[in-house]
Amino acid sequence: MDAQTAAQHLSKVRDQNPLVHSITNNVVTNFTANGLLALGASPVMAYAIEEAADMAKIAGALVLNIGTLSSASVEAMIAAGKSANENGVPVIFDPVGAGATPFRTASASKIIQEVRLSAIRGNAAEIANIAGAPDWKIKGVDAGEAGGDVVQLAKTAASGLKTVIAITGKTDVISDGADTYAVHNGDKLLTKVTGAGCLLTSVIGAFCAAGQDVLQAAVSAVSVYGSAAQLAALDTSHKGPGSFQIELLNKLASISEQEAAELAAIERVIEK
């Protein structure tokens, strides 16, 4: 897995124009759809339980996001997830806020138990909660000090949940339990845009739809998305998050394979 592989995955997404079915939250639906369109994928958001399963079976990937959940939406997600499983469609899960409330935690757990997930993306606290380590804390204040802990969390969660885990933060860590990568792309302005992480989860879905290897697809998606953010920040750092949000969409559309390869900062984590 290297920079060129990430760039090639971007080309595959644009060539294949995969249909990404995102059952996401109502705060980020529009931004997510526009981000997928900019990247070169085709978004669809079918939330009704009456059609969620039917849409999932014809999609290239299914993305489940519990940001603004309800009992009905959880049931629709599970129905869609089971349909995706039956039809060989990769399922990517974003356990937004897992651990914040009993209902949110139980909903995340139910989805994990009933749907076979290809990948899960979240921040360290969310991943720790769904992995059964809710008291886990990052030791240290920067990526260098905390890196080992995040790597171990990603590996443990991936092995325990039998899926690819992507923990995003200052340094992103992606693992399937056996192989682990750190991605050093992105920009701090991403933290000022609501839905930036949710869009990334759907971008991972697009890359998984276009590639066979889920770990490589997830690493590639995180790197390309972060690289687009870096390019957007260069053009808007003097303006602020509003301009950055729009420019991020522009850069997702315009980033070239060469730029993606040149900017990719992917490191394979080797155990010492």
UniProtKB/Swiss-Prot annotation:
Any idea which positions bind substrate? M45, G195
> Pfam families, per this entry?
HK
Catalysed reaction, written as an equation: 5-(2-hydroxyethyl)-4-methylthiazole + ATP = 4-methyl-5-(2-phosphooxyethyl)-thiazole + ADP + H(+)
| Cystine connections | none
What sort of enzyme, by top EC class, is this? transferase
User: Which BP terms does GO give this entry?
Assistant: thiamine biosynthetic process; thiamine diphosphate biosynthetic process
| Keyword annotations of the record | ATP-binding, Kinase, Magnesium, Metal-binding, Nucleotide-binding, Thiamine biosynthesis, Transferase
Its annotated pathway reads: Cofactor biosynthesis; thiamine diphosphate biosynthesis; 4-methyl-5-(2-phosphoethyl)-thiazole from 5-(2-hydroxyethyl)-4-methylthiazole: step 1/1
Entry's EC annotation: 2.7.1.50
Q: Which GO terms describe its molecular function?
A: ATP binding; hydroxyethylthiazole kinase activity; magnesium ion binding
- Cofactor(s) named in the record: Mg(2+)
Q: Which InterPro entries match?
A: Hyethyz_kinase, Ribokinase-like
Binding-site positions, ATP:
R121, T168
Please explain the role this protein plays, according to its UniProt record: Catalyzes the phosphorylation of the hydroxyl group of 4-methyl-5-beta-hydroxyethylthiazole (THZ).
Q: Which family does it belong to?
A: Belongs to the Thz kinase family.
Name of the molecule in the record: Hydroxyethylthiazole kinase
